[in-house]
């Protein structure tokens, strides 16, 4: 499972 940070 890959966790990414959304570019907010």
UniProtKB/Swiss-Prot annotation:
It comes from the Eukaryota. On the 2D-gel the determined pI of this unknown protein is: 8.9, its MW is: 42 kDa. This is Unknown protein from spot P9 of 2D-PAGE of heart tissue. It comes from Rattus norvegicus.
